[in-house]
Regions:
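Rossmann-like AdoMet/SAM-dependent catalytic core
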Residues: 1-40, 47, 53, 84-85, ...
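Short, polar loop motifs at secondary-structure junctions
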Residues: 46, 65-73
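Short loop/helix-cap segments at secondary-structure boundaries that form the rim of catalytic
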Residues: 54, 71-81, 129
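Conserved S-adenosyl-L-methionine
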Residues: 56-62
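Conserved SAM-binding motif I beta-strand of class I
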Residues: 62-67, 85
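Conserved acidic residues
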Residues: 86-90, 114
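Switch II (G3) loop of P-loop NTPases
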Residues: 113-119
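A short alpha/beta connector and helix-capping loop motif
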Residues: 121-155
């Protein structure tokens, strides 16, 4: 993976934290007057704090929650349209879904994914047209450092800009091609249609909305490219 595929840009709008403190909360962009039709949440495990708060914020959204490792939602929530006991991946079978059927019949999708490494083959399975339906993508990546990941990040970057990057302090860092990168990190992508001008991110990481994923581990601080830039000029 070329570290430059993780270039972080300045968001054109303000951001907000959604979900519980520490692990389980994510930073999203507050797009003015946005109307999401669909929230797809993958890898919810025992925490639906993000989904509950998102639905409260966008009450008209239809929500699909996926996790093959649990039998039911951790708490009852009638606002979640559907819980599917399947993991998200690159194919469809009894235990896995690639989500193509839901993506193909919906527009203005918000997707939030934490599927413990399954994100790479899943993105590989998507077409550009399917990715283009995502208004925002919130995704955790798990050690995506082989050459096969370059295509994945290039595919996302075709229609989206990375506007928020946070190191999950669970698992340390590595020196990858001369850049210190977290082994696990959270990304928020915003569709390029929302940008009138494009500027590089100059804000230090973590930001004031971020919280440690693991409270008793040290935070991981980042103040260098491609994440933080001395100038906003692209």
């Amino acid at each position: 993976m070329d570290p430059n595929v993780l270039t972080v840009y300045k968001s054109p709008f303000s951001k907000v934290r959604i979900g519980k403190n520490y692990d389980g909360g994510y930073i999203i962009v507050e797009i003015p007057n946005v109307s999401y039709t669909t929230l797809i949440a993958g890898g919810i495990c025992n925490d639906i704090s993000f989904e509950e708060e998102f639905i409260d914020k966008y009450p008209d959204v239809q929500t699909f929650a996926f996790d093959g490792t649990i039998d039911q939602l951790p708490t009852e929530n009638n606002k979640i349209s559907s819980f599917i006991k399947k993991n998200i991946g690159h194919k469809n079978n009894e235990h896995m879904t690639n989500l193509h059927d839901i993506i193909d019949v919906n527009e203005r999708i918000f997707i939030k994914i934490d599927i413990e490494g399954g994100e790479i083959p899943w993105i590989h399975s998507l077409s550009d047209d399917q990715l283009n339906k995502f208004e925002q993508i919130v995704m955790e990546f798990h050690a995506p450092y082989s050459e096969r990941e370059i295509e994945v990040f290039n595919k996302i970057n075709k229609n989206h800009y990375l506007v928020h990057f946070h190191a999950n302090n669970c698992c340390g860092v590595r020196n990858h091609r001369g850049v210190i990168i977290p082994n696990v990190f959270e990304c928020t992508y915003l569709h390029k249609k929302y940008f009138q001008t494009v500027e590089l991110n100059q804000d230090a990481i973590p930001g004031n909305l971020d919280m440690k994923n693991v409270s008793h581990h040290d935070e991981i601080y980042i103040n260098y490219p491609p994440f933080v830039h001395p100038s906003s000029v692209v």
